[in-house]
Amino acid sequence: MSLIRKKGFYKQDVNKTAWELPKTYVSPTHVGSGAYGSVCSAIDKRSGEKVAIKKLSRPFQSEIFAKRAYRELLLLKHMQHENVIGLLDVFTPASSLRNFYDFYLVMPFMQTDLQKIMGMEFSEEKIQYLVYQMLKGLKYIHSAGVVHRDLKPGNLAVNEDCELKILDFGLARHADAEMTGYVVTRWYRAPEVILSWMHYNQTVDIWSVGCIMAEMLTGKTLFKGKDYLDQLTQILKVTGVPGTEFVQKLNDKAAKSYIQSLPQTPRKDFTQLFPRASPQAADLLEKMLELDVDKRLTAAQALTHPFFEPFRDPEEETEAQQPFDDSLEHEKLTVDEWKQHIYKEIVNFSPIARKDSRRRSGMKL
């Protein structure tokens, strides 16, 4: 392989895996590995900044892997918002399409994620600032026509200045596409996803934000279901068992008859459920943890809630300049065809200066 490596690249083992990097990225250090790839940190010699580099594992193993890799590349490239992870660079050591087997994605480096710091006690001010950033990121993602669908503490990256970026679009889909299969870790998953009981839209992500915010307030997972039914039971204990108006909207007959078989119960009082929460925090949670998707807040609506008044800057609540183009999403292409599309994207990639907010909260984790 060394004979066909591009000039200006060097090879190094990172966590027992061979990485081939441009000489501009030095000191690669293993950060973590997942099902679809591994991540290391490195220093970009040009800027002196620390970056995260992701090497996808076997991106061309099958059509499904190749399509997933293509979608991840395109989504990262499309997202240009300070609260959404975006692409700084993409490269391959291959000198031509013929020897193209691997590629690497370069993103901003974030020190930790919300999952790792969930044990700490969050002040209301910190919760305001972090949840505000989640919603700004979601407003932007949703305006591009994309639903994240896998929002959980583990894919909300934060740095020591409490700046947050939404990560991991591995399972994100275009809002109009048919939504199927295993998506969000069950505990953060909206009830309409768990049961496919009614149409669903971008507010599935708002339900997840509600679950995450509740966990930040109490230090405990809000709905820790052992299985689907237990998850629903725990949700209904908090939201109450809905009445006829809601049941009429359900598409699923089994879900309909199950809900009708339960005694109707009112919603819990959120100020009692979350004694640490201010009245405004409890009110926002109530509006995000709404069973009926037609009544649940959108990201744009949630941002206008008085809870965020201390940090709100409408100029930072931007939308995507254009919708995400997933015209190849439904194409049945071969691995070689996906490979060609990815290679073309890499060759034609030109980095965009990413505008992060210069406004600092002065807050530390």
From Swiss-Prot:
Expression by tissue: Expressed in testes, pancreas, small intestine, lung and kidney. Abundant in macrophages, also present in neutrophils, CD4+ T-cells, and endothelial cells.
Motif TXY: chain residues: 180-182
Gene Ontology MF annotations: ATP binding; MAP kinase activity; protein serine kinase activity; protein serine/threonine kinase activity
Domain Protein kinase: 25-308
Active site: D150 (proton acceptor)
Activity modulation: Activated by phosphorylation on threonine and tyrosine by dual specificity kinases, MAP2K3/MKK3, MAP2K6/MKK6, MAP2K4/MKK4 and MAP2K7/MKK7. Activation by ultraviolet radiation, hyperosmotic shock, anisomycin or by TNF-alpha is mediated by MAP2K3/MKK3. Inhibited by dual specificity phosphatase DUSP1.
Pfam family, one: Pkinase
Post-translational modification: Dually phosphorylated on Thr-180 and Tyr-182 by MAP2K3/MKK3, MAP2K4/MKK4, MAP2K6/MKK6 and MAP2K7/MKK7, which activates the enzyme. Dephosphorylated by dual specificity phosphatase DUSP1.
Keyword Ligase part of the UniProt annotation: no
Enzyme Commission code(s) on record: 2.7.11.24
Binding site residues for ATP: V31, G32, S33, G34, A35, Y36, G37, S38, V39, K54
InterPro entries in the cross-refs: Kinase-like_dom_sf, MAP_kinase, MAP_kinase_CS, MAPK13, MAPK_p38-like, Prot_kinase_dom, Protein_kinase_ATP_BS
Protein's GO biological process: cellular response to anisomycin; cellular response to hydrogen peroxide; cellular response to interleukin-1; cellular response to sodium arsenite; cellular response to sorbitol; cellular response to UV; intracellular signal transduction; positive regulation of inflammatory response
Reactions catalysed, as given in the entry: L-seryl-[protein] + ATP = O-phospho-L-seryl-[protein] + ADP + H(+); L-threonyl-[protein] + ATP = O-phospho-L-threonyl-[protein] + ADP + H(+)
Effect of Y182A: Loss of kinase activity
Residue numbers bearing the Phosphothreonine modification: T180
UniProt keyword annotation of Kinase present: yes
Family according to the record: Belongs to the protein kinase superfamily. CMGC Ser/Thr protein kinase family. MAP kinase subfamily.
Domain notes: The TXY motif contains the threonine and tyrosine residues whose phosphorylation activates the MAP kinases.
Function recorded in the entry: Serine/threonine kinase which acts as an essential component of the MAP kinase signal transduction pathway. MAPK13 is one of the four p38 MAPKs which play an important role in the cascades of cellular responses evoked by extracellular stimuli such as pro-inflammatory cytokines or physical stress leading to direct activation of transcription factors such as ELK1 and ATF2. Accordingly, p38 MAPKs phosphorylate a broad range of proteins and it has been estimated that they may have approximately 200 to 300 substrates each. MAPK13 is one of the less studied p38 MAPK isoforms.
Subunit structure, interactors included: Interacts with MAPK8IP2.
Protein name per Swiss-Prot or TrEMBL: Mitogen-activated protein kinase 13
Organism field: Homo sapiens (Human)
